[in-house]
């Protein structure tokens, strides 16, 4: 694999004393994702569920503070697909929650280049967007949050979107409360280490 140079982002973050924020989106279905399980010998495990394709879409960001390297998780859940307007709403939420400059690293998806985001960037001098290289999800630490959530929720079977929303909210709060888990998501990515 060729080496990926994200050094300019790190240098700009240090120069601006900016928070680094890694953003990604994901979706969760009412149909459970089946993982490995166990059962007594000769008894096949059966997972009962309602066969509905309802889903919850989520956008989150792992923010790393510039001085103490403290990690924070920000997340918003939606009942519909995430479009450019929802990404802009999330970015405005980050700007309200985090003081100082933000360098936001995200994939180069179409929703991240929408008119509402271009307008937000033109009005906000402390927000800087940097795309990850194409086809490189392994560089985004926020993928670790989604992987952890999907493993935690595997074999579960919420009956309604509200139940799924409640379960997701509880698990996201648990992840957000764990510095070790958030740092682990960053360390498991293929990014060069920047923790002291």
Please describe what each predicted stretch is.
Residues 84-130:
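RNase H-like DDE/DDD metal-dependent nuclease/strand-transfer catalytic core used by mobile genetic elements
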Residues 22-23, 103-106, 131-133, 186:
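Short beta-strand segments
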Residues 107-108, 115, 130-154:
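RNase H-like two-metal-ion nuclease catalytic core shared by retroviral integrases
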Residues 43-50, 123-141:
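RNase H-like polynucleotidyl transferase catalytic core
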Residues 2-92, 188-194:
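Extended, low-complexity cationic-aromatic segments
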Residues 17-20, 142-196:
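C-terminal anion-handling pockets and recognition modules
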Residues 26-29, 63-67, 109-112, 135-137, ...:
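Short, solvent-exposed loop/turn segments at secondary-structure junctions
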Residues 23-27, 60, 91, 106-109, ...:
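Short, conserved catalytic/metal-binding motifs centered on acidic residues
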């Amino acid at each position: 694999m060729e080496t990926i140079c994200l050094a300019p982002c790190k240098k700009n973050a240090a120069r601006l004393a900016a928070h680094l924020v890694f953003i990604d989106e994901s979706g969760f279905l009412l149909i459970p994702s089946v993982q490995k399980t166990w059962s007594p010998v000769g008894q096949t495990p059966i997972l009962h569920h309602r066969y509905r394709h309802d889903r919850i879409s989520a956008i989150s960001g792992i923010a790393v503070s510039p001085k103490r390297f403290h990690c924070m998780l920000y997340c918003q859940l939606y009942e519909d697909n995430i479009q450019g307007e929802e990404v802009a709403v999330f970015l405005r939420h980050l700007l309200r929650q985090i003081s100082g400059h933000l360098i936001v690293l995200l994939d180069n998806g179409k929703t991240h280049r929408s008119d509402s985001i271009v307008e937000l960037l033109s009005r906000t001098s402390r927000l800087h967007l940097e795309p990850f290289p194409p086809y490189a999800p392994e560089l985004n630490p926020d993928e670790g949050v989604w992987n952890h959530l999907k493993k935690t929720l595997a074999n579960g079977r919420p009956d309604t979107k509200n139940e799924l929303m409640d379960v997701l909210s509880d698990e996201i709060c648990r992840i957000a409360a764990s510095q070790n888990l958030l740092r682990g998501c960053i360390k498991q990515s293929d990014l060069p280490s920047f923790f002291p």
